[in-house]
């Protein structure tokens, strides 16, 4: 066993016969009020943190897109959580890695995450090579071993997923959100071995003490980054990730049968007997993702190729294709409509990617945040890729 390896027994309990409380509170009277209410229903803040204790916060910041797009966790919610933990005398630390097709530094800078953490009294955890530990997953069906951040093995975790659909997994809520605590090697393996079973295996290993699903603005359609924003105005919380996720599915109008990793989790861990408290969950039917079989096969194949491509090139294969503008959701300037007004340049966090003289986008520099699409008054910037040619408006 290597210096960065350890064996770990599964900590996921069998939940059959246990009553799991799931709380849903509307945010229309303020996110702070909703946050305090859900936590109070679950036993209060002292149930989840103690003075002097380090608490790992795991938001969903999968890509450089703001929370009002439905793609990422609200920074307002994250800041409030940091504040509450600081008030208890705890030490909140933020841990997140983006999707493999996005560069870590660019994503962090898009959210100004280092400054955000510092200004709110939290620590942004480094993700250097010595921060990862290889762990054996006892009982793992397909994912037998995972490289996870050392902090999640040493401290309690509060999980902050987003209420949204996902073109590969159907939905991404609490259980899926834990992929962000994994090294890219493990993320790749999960896609190659089978994403749904792998998510279940990862949740055998890592069990947050609290799951807070951010449903202020959700996402429907071809999520989890470039779907359609959907205003919901709800926080859903539970100590049990599966119970919280099933409540999220209920709100989204999605059956557990449509989300294989949650179905498998129910079979493995038992479907929790839930006690629902707070505001009534009124079904708000989300548009389902619509991937073709060819898309799903191609997406998985990307990760198979990446296992050889990345060691040779030092860049992930899907990121390489996106940077070349070969695949992926991306902005496109319609030369017949563009009037070179410059509004896109003013809002773009990477303006060097826009060439208004030639009306082109340099995808090697583009973050694919699509801020330019919203800023373009004449609607000259379109969206190309699997999400279809459409506007964000």
Where is each model-derived feature located?
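Cysteine-rich micro-motifs
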Residues: 366, 370
